[in-house]
Amino acid sequence: MHELSLATALVETALWQAVQAEAQQIVSLKLRLGTWAGVDAEALRFAFSLVQQDTIAASAQLVIESVPAQFRCQTCGQQTPPPLLAACSHCGSDRWQLQQGRELQLQSMEVV
């Protein structure tokens, strides 16, 4: 369960930022999580609930924004969600590049 190590890193980063801001409490964390990031959002939430205990993030809410995968045809530039077929519907090419959907980013946090 690599979500535990991700949650640990997330909380450690948030705690460091909170100390820098001289905050007393972390209220919420907003995370951008791509659908192709290879991270189970519910497992991450569970791991976060374990790691946040006994810290100034103990009552923090984890808000996860899901980022859908988006591909771009490398031949014609057509943007598309994950292609169901191997060929681009616009030009017939099978050369795709993932443009978004692998994000795992702490977008913002609220502290007091």
Swiss-Prot record:
One of the GO biological process terms: protein modification process
Binding-site list for Ni(2+): 2
PROSITE patterns: HYPA
Pfam families: HypA (PF01155)
Keywords: Metal-binding, Nickel, Zinc
Biological role stated in the UniProt entry: Involved in the maturation of [NiFe] hydrogenases. Required for nickel insertion into the metal center of the hydrogenase.
Name of the molecule in the record: Hydrogenase maturation factor HypA
Lineage of source species: Bacteria, Bacillati, Cyanobacteriota, Cyanophyceae, Synechococcales
Protein's gene: hypA
